[in-house]
Amino acid sequence: MSKAFLPTILEQKEKEVAQLVMEDLQPLRQTYRLYDFLKSNQNKLQIISEVKKASPSMGDINLDVDIVAQAKTYEENGAAMISVLTDEVFFKGDISYLKEISTQVAIPTLAKDFIIDEKQIVRSRNAGATVILLIVAALPEARLKELYDFATSLGLEVLVETHNLPELEVAHRIGAEIIGVNNRNLMTFETDINTSLELSTHFKDKPVYISESAIFTGQDAALVAPYFNGILVGTALMTADNVAKKVKELQIDKG
C-alpha cells in the first residue's frame, strides 16, 4: 500500500459500494444509547473495546481469535461498547463478525469501517450495529452531514472521527454528539497521543469525546482520562495475555 493510506482505502471502498445493493431495513437492535451512557457514567474512563484481527500498520494482530468469546469478555468486564472491524481488505474484518457479535452481546456495537454511502449504513444496521463510524477526513462536509442525518434518521448513533482542529470544527458544525479524536494520522498511519491532548482544549460541553488509537497501558489512558469520556482500544486488547485484566487497567477511575 502507498504511503497515502486513506485515499487507497477510499478507492477500494468505492469499488465495494458499487457492488452493494440497498438492503431492506431490518429492525434496529435494542440497547442503551451510547451518548446517554457516556454522559451519565463520567466517574470512570469508559472503554470501547475493539475486535480487530489485522490492520495496515500492524499487519496480522490475532487471526485465530474467537471473536464472540473476545466480545463477551469485553462486555463482562465493563466495556461501554464493542467496535467491530467490518473492512475485509485492509483489516481482515467482515460484516458477518458484526452480525455474530451483535446477537451475543447486549451492549452497543460499532460498525468500524470507512463509510461513504447509505448502502453501507443500512447494511451495518441490519447486521446489528447501533453506532456507525463516519470519518471527517474521508468525506466532504456536505456529504458527511448527509450521511450523518441519514444514519440518525434510522435510529443509529454516529461516532464522528477527527484528527485535527479543522476536522473537529466540522464535527461541531454538523452537530455531532459523539466525537472521536484519532491519534493516528490516516495518511501516514503514524500515531501521537498528543493529538488528543491538543484538541481537548477546543472541546464543547454538549458532545462526548473518545480518544482513539495509541492507547496501550493504564499510563496512556491516564493521560487522556481528564479530558475524554472514553477511549477506543483495539491492538492492546487483541494482543493482551489477560484481556479482562487489560480492560480493567484501562478503566481509569475519575472519581
Curated annotation (Swiss-Prot):
Question: From which organism does this entry originate?
Answer: Streptococcus thermophilus (strain CNRZ 1066)
Please name the top-level EC class of this enzyme.
lyase
Give the reactions, separated by semicolons, that this protein catalyses. 1-(2-carboxyphenylamino)-1-deoxy-D-ribulose 5-phosphate + H(+) = (1S,2R)-1-C-(indol-3-yl)glycerol 3-phosphate + CO2 + H2O
Q: In which pathway does it act?
A: Amino-acid biosynthesis; L-tryptophan biosynthesis; L-tryptophan from chorismate: step 4/5
The family classification in the record reads: Belongs to the TrpC family.
What does UniProt list as this organism's lineage? Bacteria, Bacillati, Bacillota, Bacilli, Lactobacillales
Task: Tell me what this protein is called.
Answer: Indole-3-glycerol phosphate synthase
A single BP term in Gene Ontology: L-tryptophan biosynthetic process
One MF annotation (Gene Ontology) recorded for this entry: phosphoribosylanthranilate isomerase activity
Which domain of life does the protein's organism represent? Answer: Bacteria
Q: Known EC number(s)?
A: 4.1.1.48
The record's InterPro entries line, in alphabetical order, gives: Aldolase_TIM (IPR013785), Indole-3-glycerol_P_synth (IPR045186), Indole-3-glycerol_P_synth_dom (IPR013798), Indole-3-GlycerolPSynthase_CS (IPR001468), RibuloseP-bd_barrel (IPR011060)
The record, for Gene3D superfamilies, names:
Aldolase class I
Q: Which UniProt keywords are given for this protein, alphabetically ordered?
A: Amino-acid biosynthesis, Aromatic amino acid biosynthesis, Decarboxylase, Lyase, Tryptophan biosynthesis
